[in-house]
């Protein structure tokens, strides 16, 4: 009799939990609406929708087509909890790429965390510029230097474009280099990662290409930078030394005199407000140099040839 009662109680509890789960479970469409309602102060409606799809793929393992056809389907309590946690973190301003732990750059996946800058579309334009300008050198045994490598997205992309090149990458941050090495291992490319303070250190090699997207934001521009960027991405990778906004470009120009081969190239991403000033640093060092605009028509790159 006691055994029967126990079985009945267990069955009742099981049935009750299923009933509660059905009452309080959310549909995929309700999650979609929640993304819009909770994040509208930080993102546009289109961005909210895109974030919804990104995290549906991550949590539910569904693509956009599947999601749209299953909007009225309920999700489990565990998945509901996962979505609510993500929305809460997004509301704090944390970039979604850091929540995912990955992003895409130039068509390839890269791991990212709070120790590296999240690669920007403008930097993809820099890679495209290099690939187009130096397409005739793709099979050559080049020596390439990437200054301030961060996640390694530039150096790894170039190692894939120039498979016979010897690529070296400098960064002051050991934690950033750990992520860069993880990305290099993932893409099965060999990069010579060097931890040093580039501004005070010396170079030992002579290179065919020097490329950099260094810290170039003036500390006086801090208030212009979005909360999510300055509070969640490494400031050391964003802001130039105080009162020396062109410090990295000055050092690269100096190194181009003795550590860039004759006929070698320089490719730099720059502060759009300091295009002419940055270009001027290289006009006496390189035989050819020019200021190149990005797709938004901002002065974004300085490129040149020795």
Task: Indicate residue ranges for each PLM-predicted region.
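Short, positively charged and aromatic/hydrophobic N-terminal segments
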Residues: 15-22
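S-adenosylmethionine
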Residues: 164-165, 172-306
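Alpha-helical elements of Rossmann-like donor-binding domains used by nucleotide-donor carbohydrate transfer enzymes
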Residues: 34, 54, 82-85, 125, ...
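Glycine-rich, flexible loop/turn motifs
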Residues: 63, 71, 92-96, 101, ...
């Amino acid at each position: 009799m006691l055994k029967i009662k126990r079985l009945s109680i267990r069955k009742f509890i099981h049935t009750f939990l299923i009933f509660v789960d059905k009452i309080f479970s959310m549909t995929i469409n309700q999650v979609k609406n929640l993304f819009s309602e909770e994040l509208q102060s930080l993102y546009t409606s289109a961005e909210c929708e895109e974030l919804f799809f990104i995290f549906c793929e991550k949590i539910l393992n569904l693509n956009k087509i599947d999601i749209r056809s299953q909007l009225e389907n309920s999700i489990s309590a565990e998945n509901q909890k996962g979505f609510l946690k993500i929305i809460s973190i997004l509301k704090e301003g944390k970039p979604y790429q850091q929540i995912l732990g990955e992003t895409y750059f130039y068509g390839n996946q890269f791991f990212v965390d709070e120790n590296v800058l999240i690669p920007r579309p403008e930097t993809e334009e820099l890679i495209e510029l290099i690939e187009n300008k130096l397409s005739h050198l793709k099979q050559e045994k080049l020596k390439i230097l990437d200054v301030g490598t961060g996640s390694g997205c530039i150096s790894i992309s170039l190692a894939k474009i120039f498979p016979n090149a010897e690529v070296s990458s400098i960064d002051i941050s050991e934690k950033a280099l750990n992520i860069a090495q993880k990305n290099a291992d993932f893409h099965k490319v060999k990069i010579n990662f060097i931890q040093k303070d580039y501004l005070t250190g010396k170079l030992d090699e002579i290179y065919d290409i020097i490329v950099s997207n260094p810290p170039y934001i003036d500390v006086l521009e801090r208030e212009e930078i979005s909360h999510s960027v300055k509070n969640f991405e490494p400031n050391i990778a964003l802001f130039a030394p105080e009162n020396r906004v062109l410090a990295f470009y000055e050092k690269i120009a100096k190194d181009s005199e003795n550590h860039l081969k004759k006929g070698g190239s320089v490719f730099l991403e720059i502060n759009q407000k300091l295009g002419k000033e940055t270009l001027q640093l290289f006009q006496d060092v390189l035989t050819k140099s020019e200021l190149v605009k990005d797709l938004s028509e901002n002065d974004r790159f300085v490129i040149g040839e020795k």
